[in-house]
């Protein structure tokens, strides 16, 4: 058979690899080819079958096969080696077998005719019964390359493996898409294939760079802009220039390029606008441009009108930012404490709550002036004041703890935890505290007059600048028999009505207690009215008896005068005329209708310590009031001690004011009244004042008698408040404790009653004033005692907070408990010898903004001061 025929048959049947066709081309007759049967198109024939096939083929044509085989054996092996080296990493495959005889030098070869087959395989029969399969390239490779060259010259390079993967994608694209990059690079295809490859190698690098730039995201975004502008895509240079032009166009809308010009134009358009409304970073630029704008505006009035019109709405807009400052929680919380920002409507409230109303008014004027002033500059001044940093700062914890040491106790809304306190009573307390803080101390002068004369060591405590402090020890100190002890000399030079009050208090020993009676706030009586009445009605002989305990302020002394004292004092023999002795009985207050706090005040006014039971307080007050009225009815017969021990000072002042006669004032002016401390029994029998010498001796004797714990303590030092300082009182821990004999020793000196001023002076008064000035106020002493309290040990695992810790935690403070602690333990730690009463403690709490309550109230009637701005 013809080998060509066998070649066609094998080409149709024998495909041994997926990528290429391996053809067996023996030189035997074609019938032998038919004997070869491949198991599968992708598998090689077995060696035995090939040997059988070859053996048959060689037997048919031995001469031709031998000659050809010898030639081909040496030739093909040498020829195929270099070709196999350039193959696609396919190793030579050797098939060895032990089949029948095989003719040496036989060569089986077939060429693939299909253009898709790039490589063809050959089987070489080598002597030694081996079959070698080799791959060789077709001889007509150049012709096939020319066919592919027409489509694209890059395909050959792909076959050789010289090109990157990117080139493969380009070769697969249609010619229309390739035209753009060719146009950009301005390249032409050469006719020669080798020249094309060289040129492509050089251009591929440039195209790869450009395409890589195109692949970046930034370049992709700019490409559509170039299309919109209409740049021709033919040349890359034009496209780049178009991109740059578009960038410059877009840059006009960017922030960096336009801010300076716009800011200058705005400033030129509105030269009259205030500088505060302009950005801070553009002030210098705007100022320079404003000058040119002003010159331009002068040239044309129309521009000025337009500029003014534009500037007005801008000014209105500038007013809005300060309003937005109050949108934070901190601004709302602190707005009420900033005085400048408060409106004029709130000024009356501020004046009521503030100790210095004058300052509030000034602030109100400032705010009103700021509102009236509409110009931008004035308004900016007010805004600068408002924008000033607050007084308080957020400091580190260590500095905050240090600040507590030097900080006075002042608390805000904690005082409103208990709300039982009525507004009327609060206003009354505010007024009394304000008066007490003032230098005049007018409402307190009554108690001050009685307490001022005694020495600093005398009984009673002068509570400086605290009206309630005068109330606790206002009752006179008494001995075992109930007689009132005399007090030191008092200077009443400040008021002409003071000596008359003292005359109404006939007994020198009684004067001490009478003078220290309840201040107007505690007694809840209009002392001013009651004071004026008794002064007009005082008899001249009665003035002599009263020389004992007048205070420097006549108004208070009037109130303090007790009818019992007047009755008991029968020193001059002249009796005080009482208009109607039954009136005090009619004026008997209904103690059951009083609040517990009011009852406690009245009990404290008599010199008794606080009583827990409300019923006991009512019974005690009723008994004291009845005893006082009885003594007033039988004035000439009563002993000094009987009525004084249970007298209500506030009511005594009223009764005296009604019954005293005014004739006594001129007579007392010319007379010298010796301060007498006669024995209580002697005063009863005599009814006439004893000379000063005798009074001194009797006072010494009475001192010894009066040194007993049963007498009631009196606040003698309240008189010193008029001078501005408090006198250290002896500690009256028992309500019945008597005044110390020191009071008598200081009082036995005679008083000189001047004509019109009616002032009683003693040589010891200046010394008392100087000594009292050195003493610190009880308010500061209370603060120091509370801070000096050490930490308490836990009781049964429960912590016991100190008073200072309770205040910091806004716990309502019980006035009675705090007063007891101060009198027992608190003042001892700081070396204070004076004592305080719950009323004084309440005044201290109100001044410091501490929430305080009375013991039995349980928050119903809480005496908590409102927050003071």
Curated annotation (Swiss-Prot):
Name the Pfam families on file: Slx4
Keyword Transmembrane included in the entry's annotation:
no
List GO terms (cellular component aspect): Slx1-Slx4 complex
Q: What GO molecular-function term can you cite, just one?
A: 5'-flap endonuclease activity
Where is there biased composition of kind Polar residues? 165-174, 294-311, 647-657, 664-673, 765-774
Give the residues annotated as coiled coil: none
Signal peptide annotation: none
Return the CDD domains for the record. Answer: SAP_SLX4
Q: Where is the composition biased (Basic and acidic residues)?
A: 63-79
- For region Disordered, the annotated ranges are 40-79, 92-116, 165-199, 293-323, 351-388, 418-437, 630-774
Domain of life (superkingdom): Eukaryota
Q: Tell me what PTMs the record reports for this protein.
A: Phosphorylated in response to DNA damage.
Bias category Low complexity: which stretches? 40-59, 688-700
Bias (Basic residues) ranges: 312-322
Keywords, alphabetical: DNA damage, DNA recombination, DNA repair, Nucleus, Phosphoprotein
Please provide the Gene Ontology terms (biological process) for this protein.
DNA recombination; DNA repair; DNA replication
Its annotated compartments are: Nucleus
**HAMAP family linked to this entry:** Endonuc_su_Slx4
Spell out the subunit comment.
Forms a heterodimer with SLX1.
> What is the documented function of this protein?
Regulatory subunit of the SLX1-SLX4 structure-specific endonuclease that resolves DNA secondary structures generated during DNA repair and recombination. Has endonuclease activity towards branched DNA substrates, introducing single-strand cuts in duplex DNA close to junctions with ss-DNA.
Give the family per the record.
Answer: Belongs to the SLX4 family.
Protein name (record):
Structure-specific endonuclease subunit SLX4
